[in-house]
């Protein structure tokens, strides 16, 4: 038999339980000692001669601190400098070099890196290889004892003055360099003005071409800019192997990593510039020589006289081919658009948007004394081999705007700014100054704020840090105007090895 169990009645209080605030106010909560102050915890940061701190430190990398210039950076620049990062005591730069910031070794530390980079780089400068190009031009015209004409060609290097220019001004300076070489060399050895065999232009010389007469019937080439162009005579060529000016012209290789970039006259097959129709002879041929009277209404049906223009008003030859339909001049733009697309110049060159910056490259950030070396880099103490911890594009951008009156402004400036030096042969339809483009492009330096994410920190860093910014060729960049970095350390995880 089961024994009966007597249940006792439990009395509940009639009042509700005390509030949370009342209970917490009755006695202070117990706090373990390790939370009373910053001690040697896994997230502690210790400065020399100071007690451990929480991970609230920020490290500022400043390129132009006045206290660092005389003792640390007198021989440095804004892309390769030393800076003191210990700010909690009045240390001199020499004393700061003996101080350290120690992170708890039981944790893996990382630093959130944010940088500000400002440059003042012009688009045409020797540092970025945008001041020079080579061209093969005629340097002498001689006659031997038998009366035969001997033409001599040589490769010459042309140098542009450094500066920040628009696309139109860059083309004008390239043409001016060709003319100055002719005046200095070619003219002294019998070379004619019509023998100037390298010209940079912007027109489409095929506009107005009549398929019946095979001539440009308006008698002039359309004075409208379409795309930068290269015009060559036989024996001439342009070499952009060691120059980035081809990027400004918008003419690039389809295989950009292959060595060499030479455009010769022979490459421009199918790009001959058509000859101009002699409009004056054509109109004169249609005029009636007889007087039309009311009794007979006699009028002769004369045949139109279709002939090309052979020389300009100054007597310079247009270098016509024997067929009298085309000139010897060949245009890269015509060969690219109207030539053979499989075997012509279109098969290995590419028409691109002109990059007035010359092709801005990337820059690399190196913090060799602060960040751990990435596994893909070997530790080095040479500037050109510093391990890279961050990368970004050079803060140089091309800015474009539309100017419908570009050619009108160009004509006005010839009188006001005296830019007629760029238009030495206004009577010649080939050698005339190329028209300005309606889409004007300029190079602009825009400050860049970049968040590079979290990078692994060393467990101990020096009070003086080196900051290096190198370009794509691992050279320090003299055009860096301002470089600023902010590093925020934080614990990533516990150290497991």
UniProtKB/Swiss-Prot annotation:
Q: What is known of its domains?
A: The cell attachment RGD motif is exposed at the virion surface and is involved in binding to the integrin heterodimer ITGAV-ITGB5.
What GO MF annotations does this protein's record show? structural molecule activity
Quote the cellular component terms of the Gene Ontology held in the record: host cell nucleus; T=25 icosahedral viral capsid
**UniProt motif (Cell attachment site) ranges:** 293-295
Protein name in the entry:
Penton protein
Question: What InterPro entries does its record include?
Answer: Adeno_Penton_B
Subunit comment for this entry?
Interacts (via the cell attachment site RGD) with host heterodimer ITGAV-ITGB5; this interaction promotes virus internalization. Interacts with host WWP1 and WWP2. Interacts with the fiber protein (via N-terminal tail region). Interacts with the capsid vertex protein; this interaction binds the penton base to neighboring peripentonal hexons.
């Amino acid at each position: 038999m089961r024994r009966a169990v007597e249940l006792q009645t439990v009395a509940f209080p009639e009042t509700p339980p005390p509030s949370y605030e009342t209970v917490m106010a009755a006695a202070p909560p117990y706090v373990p000692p390790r939370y009373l102050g910053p001690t040697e915890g896994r997230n502690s940061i210790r400065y020399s001669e100071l007690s451990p701190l929480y991970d609230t430190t920020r490290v500022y990398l400043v390129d132009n601190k006045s206290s660092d210039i005389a003792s640390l950076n007198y021989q440095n620049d804004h892309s390769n400098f030393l800076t003191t990062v210990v700010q909690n005591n009045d240390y001199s730069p020499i004393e700061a070099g003996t101080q350290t910031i120690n992170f708890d070794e039981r944790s893996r530390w990382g630093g959130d890196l944010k940088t500000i980079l400002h440059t003042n780089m012009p688009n045409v400068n020797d540092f970025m290889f945008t001041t020079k190009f080579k061209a093969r031009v005629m340097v002498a015209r001689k006659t031997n004892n038998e009366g035969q004409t001997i033409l001599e060609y040589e490769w010459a290097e042309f140098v542009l003055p450094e500066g920040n220019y628009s696309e139109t001004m860059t083309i004008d300076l390239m043409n001016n360099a060709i003319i100055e070489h002719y005046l200095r060399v070619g003219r002294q050895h019998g070379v004619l003005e019509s023998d100037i065999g390298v010209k940079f232009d912007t027109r489409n010389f095929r506009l107005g071409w009549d398929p019946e007469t095979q001539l440009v019937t308006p008698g002039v080439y359309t004075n409208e800019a379409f795309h930068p162009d290269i015009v060559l005579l036989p024996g001439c060529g342009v070499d952009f192997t060691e120059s980035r000016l081809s990027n400004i012209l918008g003419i690039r290789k389809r295989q950009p990593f292959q060595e060499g970039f030479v455009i010769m006259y022979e490459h421009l097959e199918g790009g001959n510039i058509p000859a101009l129709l002699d409009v004056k002879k054509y109109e004169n041929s249609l005029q009636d020589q007889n007087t039309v009277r009311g009794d007979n209404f006699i009028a002769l049906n004369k045949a139109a006289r279709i002939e090309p223009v052979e020389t300009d008003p100054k007597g310079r030859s247009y270098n016509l081919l024997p067929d009298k339909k085309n000139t010897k001049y060949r245009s890269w733009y015509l060969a690219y658009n109207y030539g053979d697309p499989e075997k012509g110049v279109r098969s290995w060159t590419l028409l691109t948007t002109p990059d007035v910056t010359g092709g801005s490259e990337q820059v690399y950030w190196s913090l060799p004394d602060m960040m751990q070396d990435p596994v893909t880099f070997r530790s080095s103490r040479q500037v050109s081999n510093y391990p890279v911890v961050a990368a970004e594009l050079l803060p140089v951008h091309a800015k474009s705007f539309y100017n419908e009156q570009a050619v009108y402004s160009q004509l006005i400036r010839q009188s006001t700014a005296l830019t007629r030096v760029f238009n030495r042969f206004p009577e010649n339809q080939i050698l005339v100054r190329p028209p300005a483009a309606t889409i004007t492009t300029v190079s602009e330096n825009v400050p860049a704020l970049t968040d590079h994410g979290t990078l692994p920190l060393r467990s101990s860093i020096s009070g003086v840090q080196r900051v290096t910014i190198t370009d794509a060729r691992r050279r320090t960049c003299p055009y860096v105007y301002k470089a600023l970095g902010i590093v925020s350390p934080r614990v990533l995880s516990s150290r497991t090895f």
